[in-house]
Amino acid sequence: MTMVEHYPFKIHSDFEPQGDQPQAIKEIVDGIKAGKRHQTLLGATGTGKTFTMSNVIKEVGKPTLIIAHNKTLAGQLYSEFKEFFPENRVEYFVSYYDYYQPEAYVPSTDTFIEKDASINDEIDQLRHSATSALFERDDVIIIASVSCIYGLGNPEEYKDLVVSVRVGMEMDRSELLRKLVDVQYTRNDIDFQRGTFRVRGDVVEIFPASKEELCIRVEFFGDEIDRIREVNYLTGEVLKEREHFAIFPASHFVTREEKLKVAIERIEKELEERLKELRDENKLLEAQRLEQRTNYDLEMMREMGFCSGIENYSVHLTLRPLGSTPYTLLDYFGDDWLVMIDESHVTLPQVRGMYNGDRARKQVLVDHGFRLPSALDNRPLKFEEFEEKTKQLVYVSATPGPYEIEHTDKMVEQIIRPTGLLDPKIEVRPTENQIDDLLSEIQTRVERNERVLVTTLTKKMSEDLTTYMKEAGIKVNYLHSEIKTLERIEIIRDLRMGTYDVIVGINLLREGIDIPEVSLVVILDADKEGFLRSNRSLIQTIGRAARNDKGEVIMYADKMTDSMKYAIDETQRRREIQMKHNEKHGITPKTINKKIHDLISATVENDENNDKAQTVIPKKMTKKERQKTIDNIEKEMKQAAKDLDFEKATELRDMLFELKAEG
């Protein structure tokens, strides 16, 4: 058993909260202390929401889970929080699959697709680091994607199976080795890696699953632990002496031997009942398939203690009743903790939708004899269960969704940007002669070396408009969903560099389109109500022009819809608040100068002057060149992950998939 140690949260920053940040921090902190369950931070683009969240965590002093809606965003937040809290445990918990094809069955073609996955070892290490941190200290911030609501092993079992070693403790070497094997560590004296241990005489070296380069050297003197040291596993350099060390299990799905026996009996009983059911329905093929697959898994469990796809038996392994709520990362937090949901208008619907998608796929597998019905219990949480498990939540969004609005009695607003930048001016113009009018507006921006985003409603309109603009001599490109990640990043970069002056697209709300050079956003068909022209989408689109001090938005429409009116009024309200603040403090709005990164690059061996020259990937390559480029990108991706630059690593990974697919 390990004791949770107490440490205060300490922020490292050159800045103090300013603008309306102090007020927002105070309101949220007071709300949490008063026991409020739901609060929403309505933070406009560029107002420093992350800094506000950090200050709230520091004041409240509770372990905190921050959920983002994708890995890229989680990686970005992880880097930012790590900078703010270098002395505290900031952890990263996302799906460890670089690539994941879940097992599935297509009845119409009688095709079974085996589970195929590539696990990222570094992310697996970070997941172990996150869960073990929660049992070691209370100053923990975990940045997670929605994968935190997926099944994980029993936290009590995980905690109880910790192997605790202490100097002076009576324990012989073979007892330690036995305990390590029980928690799924394997002995490997040659290939020493995470989750293994090696033995040299009276010295046992253990590579914990939660560590990256650090192993633990335990030295014995007879039946007593004589010395414990932290060692660099590569160089053998001793880093520090330890009095005590807790070794957490190498897997989150770890089960004691006596429990495994009970679990196997339960699986056999369920198999017997299910086979009878299938045979009674004359589904003989399905029955044979299920019997064969399950018996193979059971044999593996008896011999090895685990099997491939063991998570499908999690309800039995944790001895829970069928249909009960699975254990997830949320259960690893204690009783008093905090949840923050970033971009909640996107993240909450994602949390809500996870269960149904997963259920539909697994039901087909169960119906056709690929899995036992209990496999349905290896699932993400239902939304109601998520609500039940979370005690206090802070939603963070520039455009809160219906759930947040319904559950929060009063929004905590953060409208003022420390940079003084105002929300853009909005003008509504009639659709008559809109294209000629648009061209003259673009011309004005081009002369000032500024960029333009144009959003349309249909793919055809985007294509036609792009062609028309090209014929009119405008440097324009078209961004649509079929464009690969690689090209997409390249197009945005080229817009910033001035290769293009205009980008035309349908949904320009995806992350990565915050471009300070954009001074004009044009919304065509603004009066056509629908998902892309809802008040939330309009406010988000308008926000794309809020990073430039000359930011303007033109909506072409023949009538004023409720969504337009709301978006215009809200933008004007925020604009006035910022203007008053600027006037009071003598701030002059200034466009943010954001460095243009060359992400579309593969590190290549180049001339002596340039150690890390980066080349743009050529469009046509020989097989040999392609392989060399793939190797280079892979190297760069691993380096980026090591440097905790997950945003870059994710983009490089997507590039890698595309290059491999093209090969």
UniProtKB/Swiss-Prot annotation:
Binding site for ATP: 43-50
Keyword terms of this UniProt record: ATP-binding, Cytoplasm, DNA damage, DNA excision, DNA repair, Excision nuclease, Nucleotide-binding, SOS response
Keyword Translocase: no
Alphabetical list of SMART domains matching this protein: DEXDc, HELICc
Subcellular location: Cytoplasm
Biological process according to GO: nucleotide-excision repair; SOS response
Single GO MF annotation: ATP hydrolysis activity
Stretches assigned to the Helicase C-terminal domain: 434-600
Family: Belongs to the UvrB family.
HAMAP family per record: UvrB
Record comment regarding domains: The beta-hairpin motif is involved in DNA binding.
Protein's UniProt name: UvrABC system protein B
Record lineage: Bacteria, Bacillati, Bacillota, Bacilli, Bacillales
